[in-house]
Amino acid sequence: TALRKYIREVGDLPVNITFMMEGAEESASTDLEKYLEKYRDDLLPADLLVWEQGNRNSKGQLEITGGNKGIITFDLSVESADVDIHSKFGAVIESASWYLLNAISSMRDDQGRILIDGIYEKIVQPNELEMNLIETYAIENADSLRRIYGLKLPILESDRRAFLKTYYFEPALSIEGISTGYQGQGVKTILPAQSRAKMEMRLVPGLTPEYVLECIKAHLKKEGFDRIKVTFTLGEESYRSDMSDQAI
C-alpha cells in the first residue's frame, strides 16, 4: 500500500525492492533456511533488509528495531534411581529434583547475572551511539513492566540506564518449564527418580548457540553436575544493525 501510494504521488522508486513473505514464524520457520539458501544469489546483493512487522509501542508509535537477540534452547535432565524412592530416605539419598534444581541455581545468581564462565567475556559491548539511541528513544522501564504484567516479584534492575543496557545488550538465562515428581492431588511422599527442565538463553552479538552450549556443558561438569544430560533443541544467532549506516 505504501509503495503504491509513493508511486502514485511521487513517481518511480529510487531503489530496487524485493519482497519476501514467510508465514511460519510462530512454528519456528523450519523451512526458512532452505528458502534463503535456494535464493541466496538473489538476496545477498541487497544493501538493507527491512523486516516489516507494523508493531506499535504502548504510546501508539511505530518502532524501528535495529537488531534482535538470538536464542539457544536446551533441555536438562537427570535420573537419580531406577524408581521413585520413599521420602524417608531423604536425609541420606539425593533426589533428581534437588540435583537438577541445584544445577540450575549454579548457572544464575539472584540478580539475573549468568554465572557460566565465558559468557560475558565474549559479548560485543554497545557503542556510544547505540547507548544514546536507547536512552533517548526506548520507552521500556521497570514501572511500565510492573503495570503491564502485574509483576508480583521484585524486578531485577530498576536503574534506568542499567535496565536498558541489560535488556537490550546482555544475555538472559531463563527456565521455560520444570517437570519433576508428583503433581497430582493430595500427597505422595517420594524422592523423584527423574527430573527435567526446559531452558533458554537469549543471545547477543559475540555469542553463538554452539559456543554457549559448550560453555553450559563445561560449567555443569566444573560445578560437579556431570550427571546432568544436556540436549540442544534450537539455536539462532543474534544480529545488531550498524545504526550509523547511511541506509538506516
Label each PLM-derived region with a short phrase:
Residues 1-67:
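Acidic/histidine-rich catalytic neighborhood of metal-dependent amide-processing enzymes
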Residues 56-57, 73-248:
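Metal-dependent amide/peptide-bond hydrolase catalytic core
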